[in-house]
Curated annotation (Swiss-Prot):
One of its GO terms (molecular function) is aldose 1-epimerase activity. This is Uncharacterized protein YphB. It comes from Escherichia coli (strain K12). SUPFAM superfamilies: Galactose mutarotase-like. It comes from the Bacteria. InterPro entries: Aldose_1/G6P_1-epimerase, Gal_mutarotase_sf_dom, GH-type_carb-bd.
């Protein structure tokens, strides 16, 4: 495992080639993402990529253009093919400078055969990450992208992200029924604290922008996705699930498609890529000092 360090002014970024994950993002000594453990395990990191799609496909199967495809579980602790392969694979460095890095990963087994590049770039106040995935298989398939960033959480943390509804969670951490009425504790259309309880829900009607305020540290993070991501997930763990969890981090995950879009007509917001075709998504995290 190799750790690549980028810096620009007071910003510093650590990225690992194992999983293509971010292992830390700081302004001087202030963590802007949860510091990673540099363990080689993506769920211990600060952020990991979601490719060739995000979240899960119920039943580990989908029908596309008249053909049925069967996915296989890819981690021991989940019954589903979870978050794709990029977060579990070994990436290769193709370029590295003081403030920029580009990694690539190729996957040639299972249903999806593809090549993905992930470019990181720092400016004085912004981290920009760009994912570009190319279908290297023999068939047209539905693709999506996203990221799984972990943010510091305190009682003072506030988040704001537009939504017109959300999916309930059902068994095996799958997205369930869609509800247009947001409960007060999950309504982030205006800045609001996160509930001190388990949350694992997707939100629809997003404009691709979010604001995460950390007043105790004197800063806010402004997330922006290009093209605007239509969905985000909020994850807050629980000590009953993770014995070491102390309500000290949460995830706000931008996704280019809704959960389980493989089962929606024409793949929902998933993008059909013919062999050789590509799709690109970008996430920026801008630091604003309060």
């Amino acid at each position: 495992m190799t750790i690549y360090t980028l810096s620009h002014g007071s910003l510093k970024l650590d990225v690992s080639d194992q999983g293509g994950v971010i292992e830390g993002f700081w302004r001087d000594t202030t963590p802007l993402l949860r510091p990673g453990k540099k363990s080689g395990v993506a769920t211990d990191a600060s952020c990991f990529p979601l490719v060739p799609f995000a979240n899960r496909v119920s039943g580990n199967r989908f029908v596309w253009q008249g053909r049925e495809y069967q996915l296989q579980p890819n981690v021991e602790w989940d019954a589903h093919y979870l978050h794709g392969d990029g977060w579990l694979g070994e990436w290769q460095c193709v370029s590295h400078s003081d403030d920029s890095l580009c990694l690539v990963y190729e996957h040639r087994s299972g249903v999806y055969h593809y090549r993905v590049s992930q470019a990181f770039h720092l400016t004085a106040d912004t981290l920009t990450v760009t994912l570009s995935v190319t279908n290297q298989g023999a068939e047209t398939l539905p693709f999506g992208t996203g990221w799984h960033p972990y943010f510091p959480l305190s009682p003072q943390t506030r988040i704001q992200a537009q939504a017109s509804g959300y999916w309930l969670e059902r068994e095996q951490w799958l997205a369930g029924e869609f509800c247009e009425q947001l409960p007060q504790e999950l309504d982030f259309n205006q800045p609001a604290p996160l509930p001190r309880q388990w949350v694992n829900n997707g939100f629809a009607g997003w404009n691709g922008q979010a604001r995460i305020e950390q007043p105790q540290e004197g800063y806010a993070i402004i997330m922006e996705t290009t093209p605007p991501a239509p969905c985000y997930f909020i994850f807050v763990s629980d000590p009953a699930f993770d014995k070491g969890y102390a309500f000290d981090f949460f995830c706000l995950e931008p996704m280019s498609h809704a959960p389980d879009d493989h089962h929606r007509p024409e793949g929902g917001d998933l993008i059909a890529l013919a062999p050789g075709e590509s799709t690109t998504s970008e996430m920026s995290l801008r630091v604003e000092w309060l």
